[in-house]
Amino acid sequence: MKFRLEPLLNLRKHHEDDCKYKLKKEEVVLLSIQRELAAVDQRTAQEAEYLEKVGTGRIDPFLLSSGSSFLSYLWQKRVEIDEARVSQEKQVAAAREDLISARKERKTMEKLKENFMKQQNKAALNREQKTLDEIGISLVHLGKR
């Protein structure tokens, strides 16, 4: 006998695959945000070091103002990227939860299928044993005649 929930099991498998894909996609986006954040941090450190070098000795007001405005831009950019990173981490966590849920559903369906197959095998063995018992009883009765 065929497992009647097989189409549902297949849907669960496809749903799990979709969840895996979405999780990987979100993780790639998070990784790119983290790389961008690292690049901004590196650029900020370079700019601060440069301003410190240039600021020693004579001070050029134009250079100082443009450097500090660029630094404030970099700091603002870092805040924006950090907010995007936090948001993306939440999306990754949600995708991970969806994947865990999909795996549980698939494993439940597979367990149901496994139990169904065990019952079917047991029933088939019982039918076969019953048939063999009937054949044996028939042979015994034939031998008594």
Per-region residue spans from a language model:
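Charge-rich amphipathic alpha-helical interaction elements
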Residues: M1-R145
